[in-house]
């Protein structure tokens, strides 16, 4: 497999959050689409098997790709990111396999929703997952797994909720 790690304008991405004080103005969806085309042409990758992922602003950009250009990606993983409560994206409503990884102790991306450090408002992690479960036509009841706590002294635990793809839909984790 191949990994491409692009950097957005001014080290950030124009990621749909219209109320974020630090959002650049570039057309990052077009930039990433052109990057995928160039890499596919130059290195022979299968453009139908491209996945997007990112942390924080990069996670929000992955969400934007899924919303506005689902034909560019086969799925996405958003880390420390949630749906914008003040989105300027135009959503296609297409089903896109989704993975969200958020932590309840994150001081920048509030797991319970609300204002981020840059002033942008986001839905809670739970609301974001529910929105994608509905959008993707996933099964409403998840399979829940609690990961073994290998270090009980670190104060953290991991829970995985898997929403299977419904007929014609896509899964959400």
Q: Where in this protein do the model-derived segments appear?
A:
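Serine-hydrolase catalytic machinery in alpha/beta-hydrolase-like enzymes
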Residues: 1-51, 60-68
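Active-site-adjacent mobile loop/cap segments within catalytic or ligand-binding domains
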Residues: 173
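Primarily recognizes the serine-hydrolase "nucleophile elbow" in alpha/beta-hydrolase
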Residues: 40-42, 47-96, 107
